[in-house]
């Protein structure tokens, strides 16, 4: 079980590295097998295949795969790309410089085969492109007469080259047999097997004096046997080529149009074969191009959103800091006012006006704290904080709209790129198919069966062409309606809104606490003022009562003095009498 897990882990790592290399070098992979390997090890390709062919997979597995793919593209891939760039800059490039400086001294002759292999692949690639795009255009300028003369010259120089090649090959084999081995037999076999029709039946003459030159310098029996074989091959080839040359000349003089039809038939067959092969790959090419454009769109959107959110996160951080500072300033102002509610009244000795001190009596305050003043402070704080939070919400909404507009612009740009690519592809394909139809209509084969087959192939190709064109249109609509991943934008917006709501709730609760504290302070001050007034009133009443009692006592004293005076006068009068 442990070995199986290790094997699965190793395969997973290898496939992941292969896919990363394929994606990183998607534009520079020229090997068809490598492209095929990259294609059939791509999880996205299999996901698309199973989604089209399995309804259960499409409903149950594909949505989860899409989520994982988006998370990889947005969270993992950027980190890997950055790490790759850093490693390439720090380690790989310096290492390549050192290796390059050492490789300058190497002799690369022994690596000929390593260089030859990609050159052969490149030659095959250009040859295929030549047959597909260049050769049809060249055939338009080469008439039948020109082709016949050109073919005669080619056959002539081919015979001469064949003759000298045989001599050179024999000399090389005689001197470097231990290196060359059986190269001559292989090469001569290619020339001999190139066209064996009618060779044995057409050779009737003996070797000429020119041909016998090849056997003059033979010294051993094995060399003589080999030389005889080579001479016979040359004679057969020359005889065949002369017959072909005479036949071509007769055709050129007798019927110029028949040669044109013959050449065009070959072109037609090649074009039909190429169309059949290319149509099989066209659908897959469109799907791959669609996936590439979608990946490019998601990559551009992810890159833009990352930069935009980082920038706006810094801006909102500064805004929240400013909001926090202003709120603390307002809260401090209200707290000082609440502390000064319980103030001490005094009289200015110079002006005689009332002045007020804090409850300790050591610091003079600017004004007497009233309910109206504190209420004004609360209203100012609440309105200012509401304006700031509303402005932040408005900015957040504008940022979201800006991101959506930019994403739509990126989508439209990628759709335009795909449309341009599709127009070029459709235009090129229509030209190729129209060219093949012209060949079929004007220079086709005389055989009715072959002509019907070509017409049937042309009809099938045009249907495939129409199907591919519709597929391009459907892919364009898919790109136009492909939804971007705005989850990070929504998360950022929710985070900011949550923080604004949290600040609003906290500031509201703190203002409520300050308001309650202010009410308690005012109630305490009003209670003390009522008690003071009651005491003053009671003291005034007591003072008035004392004054009344004092007045009454004075009146009673005055009455007593009057009575005493009257009694004295009466007594005096009586004694006098």
Curated annotation (Swiss-Prot):
GO terms for biological process: ascospore wall assembly. Residues 525-577 are annotated as: Disordered. Keywords: Coiled coil, Mitochondrion, Ribonucleoprotein, Signal, Sporulation. GO terms for cellular component: endoplasmic reticulum; mitochondrion; ribonucleoprotein complex. It comes from the Eukaryota. Residues 379-416, 513-562 form a coiled coil. Residues 525-545 have a biased composition (Basic and acidic residues). It is found in: Mitochondrion. The keyword Ribonucleoprotein applies. Residues 564-577 have a biased composition (Low complexity). Disruption phenotype: A combined deletion of the OSW7 and SHE10 has reduced dityrosine incorporation in the outer spore wall. Residues 1-23 form the signal peptide. Present with 8640 molecules/cell in log phase SD medium. Belongs to the OSW/SHE family. Component of the mitochondria-localized RNase mitochondrial RNA-processing (RNase MRP) composed of one single RNA encoded by the NME1 gene and at least 31 proteins. Absent in the nucleus-localized RNase MRP (NuMRP). Involved in spore wall assembly. May be a component of the mitochondrial RNase MRP (MtMRP), a ribonucleoprotein endoribonuclease involved in the cleaving RNA transcripts to generate primers for DNA replication in mitochondria. Causes growth arrest when highly overexpressed. This is Outer spore wall assembly protein SHE10.
């Amino acid at each position: 079980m442990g070995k199986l897990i290790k094997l699965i882990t190793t395969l997973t790592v290898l496939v992941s590295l292969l896919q990363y290399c394929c994606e990183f070098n998607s534009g520079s992979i020229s090997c068809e097998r490598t492209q095929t390997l990259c294609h059939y090890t791509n999880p996205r390709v299999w996901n698309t295949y199973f989604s089209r062919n399995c309804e259960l997979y499409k409903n149950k597995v594909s949505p989860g795969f899409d989520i994982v793919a988006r998370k990889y593209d947005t969270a993992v891939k950027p980190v890997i790309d950055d790490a790759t760039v850093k490693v390439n800059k720090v380690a790989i490039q310096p290492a390549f410089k050192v290796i390059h400086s050492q490789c300058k001294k190497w002799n690369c002759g022994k690596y000929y085969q390593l260089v030859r292999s990609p050159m052969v692949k490149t030659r095959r690639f250009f040859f295929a492109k030549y047959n597909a795009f260049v050769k049809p255009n060249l055939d338009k300028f080469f008439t039948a007469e020109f082709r016949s003369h050109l073919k005669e010259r080619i056959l002539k120089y081919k015979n001469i080259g064949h003759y000298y090649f045989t001599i050179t090959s024999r000399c090389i084999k005689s001197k470097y047999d231990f290196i060359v081995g059986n190269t001559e037999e292989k090469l001569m076999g290619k020339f001999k097997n190139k066209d064996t029709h009618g060779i044995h039946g057409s050779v009737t003459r003996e070797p000429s004096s020119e041909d016998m030159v090849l056997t003059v310098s033979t010294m051993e029996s094995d060399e003589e046997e080999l030389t005889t074989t080579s001479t016979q091959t040359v004679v057969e080839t020359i005889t065949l080529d002369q017959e072909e040359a005479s036949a071509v000349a007769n055709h050129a003089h007798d019927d110029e149009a028949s040669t044109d039809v013959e050449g065009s038939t070959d072109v037609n067959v090649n074009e039909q074969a190429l169309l059949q092969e290319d149509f099989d790959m066209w659908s897959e090419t469109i799907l791959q191009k669609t996936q590439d454009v979608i990946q490019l769109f998601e990559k551009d959107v992810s890159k833009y959103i990352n930069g935009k959110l980082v920038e706006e996160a810094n801006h909102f951080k500064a805004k929240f800091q400013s909001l926090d500072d202003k709120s603390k300033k307002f809260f401090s102002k209200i707290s000082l006012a609440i502390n000064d509610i319980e103030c001490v009244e005094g009289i200015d000795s110079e002006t005689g006006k009332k002045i007020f001190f804090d409850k300790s009596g050591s610091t003079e305050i600017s004004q007497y704290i009233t309910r109206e003043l504190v209420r004004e402070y609360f209203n100012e704080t609440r309105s200012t904080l509401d304006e700031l939070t509303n402005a932040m919400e408005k900015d957040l909404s504008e940022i979201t709209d800006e991101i959506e507009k930019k994403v739509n612009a990126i989508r439209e740009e990628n759709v335009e790129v795909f449309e341009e690519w599709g127009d070029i592809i459709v235009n090129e394909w229509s030209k190729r198919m129209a060219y093949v139809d012209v060949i079929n209509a004007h220079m086709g084969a005389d055989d009715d069966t072959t002509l019907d087959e070509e017409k049937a192939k042309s009809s099938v190709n045009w249907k495939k062409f129409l199907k591919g064109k519709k597929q391009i249109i459907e892919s364009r609509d898919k790109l136009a309606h492909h939804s971007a991943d705005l989850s990070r934008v929504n998360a950022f917006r929710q985070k900011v809104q949550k923080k604004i709501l949290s600040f609003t709730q906290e500031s509201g609760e703190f203002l409520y606490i300050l308001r309650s504290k202010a009410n308690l302070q005012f109630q305490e001050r009003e209670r003390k003022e009522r008690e003071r007034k009651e005491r003053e009133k009671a003291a005034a009443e007591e003072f008035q009562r004392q004054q009344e009692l004092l007045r009454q006592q004075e009146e009673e004293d005055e009455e007593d003095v009057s009575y005493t005076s009257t009694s004295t006068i009466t007594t005096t009068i009586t004694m006098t009498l």
